[in-house]
């Protein structure tokens, strides 16, 4: 009900965020959603700070962002699964660019393995990249936001953080953890009177990026695989409207509501109906 009311309100927002002058840091900016979000923000007067381990891809994002109108773009090599490197690069950003005012945590990975195929190291590394990286970046950049009671935390979670999915136990666990983390941080900020700091949690279905490895939906009318450019436009719009949740497509809303009262067997039947296991096997089973 809250999500429905929030979306109705966001159709007619009282105000929209102005991006001019914001310092926006994006993790995982070399390709996919992170790259497209950077390109969408480029003409809006922001300073872009791009973090990725793919140096060439990140340089290309920077070039395209400047081509799109960005006047200030800073590129950093950062392995977000490495705590020391995150804090080291965060110090550099503060000294060379300034305090980050919009933090977009987007770096992530999806292995697409079954639970018994995943090694302990697989689980640890997925949690480091997808979840712990967001803890470390929030710890690095949130204090400055708190000091001035202004800022925006944007976390790319997933519909998989709301629904446990086939061949994605490590991924689902990490994305569910992100949702819990960001809801908790938002609660603490609110009750401490720091209501100028906004939070947006992004929960998409599959998006056509390297991460999805050619995943194809068997029921595209209900569960489309979004183009990254379209997804990025929705994300930027959600930030502009200061939405707390962006869940897409609408069918994910329905499933989230249904699992709270339907028998588990019915949920599994719905998974079979949309042929999700078959889609995952086709995309990841051959790896």
Positions of predicted regions on the chain:
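Canonical Rossmann dinucleotide-binding motif of NAD(H)/NADP(H)-dependent dehydrogenases/reductases
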Residues: 10-49
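Conserved glycine-rich Rossmann-like NAD(P)H-binding loop of the short-chain dehydrogenase/reductase
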Residues: 46-60
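SDR active-site lid
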Residues: 188-252
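Substrate-binding pocket helix/loop in short-chain dehydrogenase/reductase
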Residues: 114-115, 119-124
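The beta1-alpha1 cofactor-binding region of Rossmann-like NAD(H)/NADP(H)-dependent oxidoreductases
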Residues: 55-56, 76-88, 120
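Residue(s) in the substrate-gating loop at a strand-loop-helix junction
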Residues: 158
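Active-site helix of classical SDR
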Residues: 138, 174
